[in-house]
Swiss-Prot record:
Protein name, as recorded: Beta carbonic anhydrase 4
Location of the protein in the cell: Cell membrane
Coiled-coil intervals, chain numbering: 47-76
Topology in the lipid bilayer: Peripheral membrane protein
Disruption phenotype: In plants lacking both BCA1 and BCA4, impaired CO(2)-regulation of stomatal movements associated with reduced beta carbonic anhydrase activity in guard cells, and increased stomatal density.
Primary location recorded for the protein, binned into one broad class: membrane
UniProt lineage: Eukaryota, Viridiplantae, Streptophyta, Embryophyta, Tracheophyta
Sequence positions bearing S-nitrosocysteine: 223
Length: 280
């Protein structure tokens, strides 16, 4: 049986010892008390100083409350998972403790509204998942984007997945950012995002050229799917992916989840990426 959450949190997750945590709590409470005492004893404090002290006191209390809420959410979330899933599916989790044999490698956006385990009801052990901004798959390059490359290699070469699914979605902020990049414009102050979404630049260019009369929002909608097609094409630049596709032991598909309408579109890669199915 898994250890109790309280022990797990204290010994596995905490960065400080219990003694230091207690000291930190005492220091925090002492700071609050000191500020309140200062307000009550120093009647001659200027209005500005008094207001700043009150604001600081309120901010400290709010921060403590926020931290407590976050910890409680994590605790109750794990407790519910353990009670409703882990303990009720002992056979599955005993098997997963020894190995994993997922059938899917899934690329999905980091957007909090599009978790593939929820929208496609994947159970533990079913899908090896990679999430990033705008669900991008960069082309094969051993010197760049090695995190994605390592995930693809592990899933295809070692886990022997039979399916790769790249899922785009409605209202994607990454795609909106991509479509907002102007030709020959100076780089933005973004440290990572702009260069990352430019992986889908060919999708942006195609939509801009073929649908120049559409509104920006409509262009973004089309680019959400076209960027998936670019990622599907990029997957074929990985030698180990291409080899399995040629042997017909690996299928590559694109998907698009519209959480506004509650629909999911699915299409297969036949080197043309033509739409095949739609669910509603």
């Amino acid at each position: 049986m898994a250890p109790a959450f309280g022990k797990c949190f204290m010994f596995c997750c905490a960065k400080t010892s219990p003694e230091k945590d207690e000291m930190a709590t005492e220091s925090y409470e002492a700071a609050i008390k000191g500020l309140n005492d200062l307000l009550s004893t120093k009647a001659d404090l200027g209005n500005v100083a008094a207001a700043k002290i009150k604001a600081l006191t309120a901010e400290l209390k709010e921060l403590d409350s926020s931290n407590s809420d976050a910890i409680e959410r994590i605790k109750t979330g794990f407790t519910q998972f353990k009670t409703e899933k882990y303990l009720k599916n002992s056979t599955l989790f005993n098997h997963l403790a020894k190995t994993q044999t997922p059938k899917f490698l899934v690329f999905a956006c980091s957007d909090s509204r599009v978790c593939p385990s929820h929208i496609l009801n994947f159970q533990p052990g079913e899908a090896f998942v990679v999430r990033n901004i705008a669900n991008m798959v960069p082309p094969f390059d051993q010197k760049r984007h090695s995190g994605v490359g390592a995930a693809v290699e592990y899933a295809v070469v070692h886990l022997k997945v039979e399916n790769i699914l790249v899922i785009g979605h409605s209202c994607c902020g990454g795609i909106k950012g991509l479509m907002s990049i102007e030709d020959d414009a100076a780089p933005t102050q973004s440290d990572f995002i702009e260069n990352w979404v430019k992986i889908g630049a060919s999708a942006r260019n195609k939509i801009k050229e073929e649908h120049k009369d559409l509104s920006y929002d409509d262009q973004c909608n089309k680019c959400e799917k076209e960027a998936v097609n670019v990622s599907l094409g990029n997957l074929l630049s990985y030698p180990f992916v291409r080899a399995e596709v040629v042997k017909n032991t690996l299928a590559i598909r694109g998907g698009h989840y519209n959480f506004v309408k509650g629909t999911f579109d699915l299409w297969e890669l036949d080197f043309k990426t033509t739409p095949a199915f739609a669910f509603s």
